Amino acid sequence: MTLLDSDSRQSAEVLPAAGPAPDRPRTYQVRTFGCQMNMHDSERIAGLLEAAGYVRAADDEPADVVVFNTCAVRENADNRLYGNLGLLLPVKKAKPDMQIAVGGCLAQKDKGDIVRRAPWVDVVFGTHNIEALPVLLERARIAREAQVEIREALEVFPSTLPSRRESVYAAWVAISVGCNNTCTFCIVPSLRGRERDRRPGDILREIQTLVADGVLEVTLLGQNVNSYGVDFGDRQAFAKLLRACGTIDGLERVRFTSPHPRDFTDDVIAAMAETPNVMPQLHMPLQSGSDAVLRRMRRSYRKEKYLDIISRVRSAIPDAAITTDIIVGFPGETEDDFAETLDVVRKARFAGAFTFQYSKRPGTPAAEMPDQVPPDVVADRFARLVALVEQIALEENQAQVGRVVEVLVAEGEGRKDAETHRMSGRAPDNRLVHFRATDARPGDVVTVAVTQAAPHCLIADQVLGVRRTRAGDAWEARRSVRPSGVLLGMPALRPRT
């Protein structure tokens, strides 16, 4: 096993894929766990592999290379990875030339321990060096030993790498990586590093390239998007970036995730309200409604500030759909603390919430805190929270019945579309809408009247119109001729030493 640290300067040049059959390129599959940033990075991993000569494996065939892009936020992330690795062991025994690579946050955290626990893994790479993957795969193949390379600092911004996007009509655009916050439950800053911001011009050029390729919607990504600009000393940079997105011809929808309440300022609210293609949607993590718990979480805002932001957003954008993240059972949480969380949920009237039972993560301050809440108490509170969230989400969705909305048709959003003879997509406020099937293509825009509501979706049995778009044209073109990769920039590669 080879372990390379952040001082290593080996080449990251893209090498051709080698395989047992010279007449057949090696195939790959990328499996992604975790957040939107991981989805973004997985598209870059796929782009790197395709630039190196690999081709995407068909769904019904075992891949020559399987890459896991992992998450480390919750305890079950470990179990999920090692469970999947265990399932691949007999496959690899039957197919010795198969290679398995593990990247992402869990790889950054566990490093060589992954190979010790699963010695059939060929490559381990971290969050700071995804550009090295093709070289590491080739080196592992030639050396017949695992290659473990973890760096402690980012050298190549992932957004400059080749990309194989999953969607032709919507795209992730990273505006920053890393995080300067120190939430006591979160391990991400230690794995992704401190915040580093891309320059606005680079971001806007990437978006313009995406739009030229047919994209209608972009989602701006960062661990804390509204602290964007701290790296180059402009506290209003995020609001300026939103307004600049409004000047790009052909860009119909702009979203962003995730902001931090501490940095949510009036200039951002004004930019959201005054930029027509910034969608009336906000996902802003609450985590807890108790000031005492927020203090222990080191969240640097309190209940009333959070509710005040919600009020100001709704005053400027009355139709905004607001969603959130909530953790139940944080160490020391009392029944009174939990009641404060329920109170915020009732007052904020979220359109939806991602709810989590607190998961102890080794290496975080919260893992060492006293007064860990018993699992049965956590489970009871979690069930009560979910029931309230779903009740309010249903009521908020029922208020949408009768409204006419434009839906960007999506691919794969509705699991039951085939049996219900419906298609699915997203309204401007990001609500999921299932509508009566038409000849619309993914990427087209349909105008529908909402006829029914459920906690997690809207149903529209009345389709009023279909607008064919260049995004739909791009989807149709990709379906007929599957491209080998989509380049959004030239890789910034280090020379061989």
From Swiss-Prot:
Subcellular location: Cytoplasm
Self-association state and partner proteins as the record states: Monomer.
One MF annotation (Gene Ontology) recorded for this entry: metal ion binding
GO annotation, cellular component aspect: cytosol
Family: Belongs to the methylthiotransferase family. MiaB subfamily.
Taxonomic superkingdom: Bacteria
Main location: cytoplasm
Extent of Basic and acidic residues compositional bias: 1-10
Annotated Pfam families: Radical_SAM, TRAM, UPF0004
PANTHER family: CDK5 REGULATORY SUBUNIT-ASSOCIATED PROTEIN 1 (PTHR43020), MITOCHONDRIAL TRNA METHYLTHIOTRANSFERASE CDK5RAP1 (PTHR43020:SF2)
The encoding gene: miaB
Function: Catalyzes the methylthiolation of N6-(dimethylallyl)adenosine (i(6)A), leading to the formation of 2-methylthio-N6-(dimethylallyl)adenosine (ms(2)i(6)A) at position 37 in tRNAs that read codons beginning with uridine.
Record keywords, A-Z: 4Fe-4S, Cytoplasm, Iron, Iron-sulfur, Metal-binding, S-adenosyl-L-methionine, Transferase, tRNA processing
Catalytic activity: N(6)-dimethylallyladenosine(37) in tRNA + (sulfur carrier)-SH + AH2 + 2 S-adenosyl-L-methionine = 2-methylsulfanyl-N(6)-dimethylallyladenosine(37) in tRNA + (sulfur carrier)-H + 5'-deoxyadenosine + L-methionine + A + S-adenosyl-L-homocysteine + 2 H(+)
HAMAP family the UniProt entry points to: tRNA_metthiotr_MiaB
Binding-site positions, [4Fe-4S] cluster 2: 179, 183, 186
Domain Radical SAM core: 165-395
EC number(s) reported in the record: 2.8.4.3
Protein name: tRNA-2-methylthio-N(6)-dimethylallyladenosine synthase
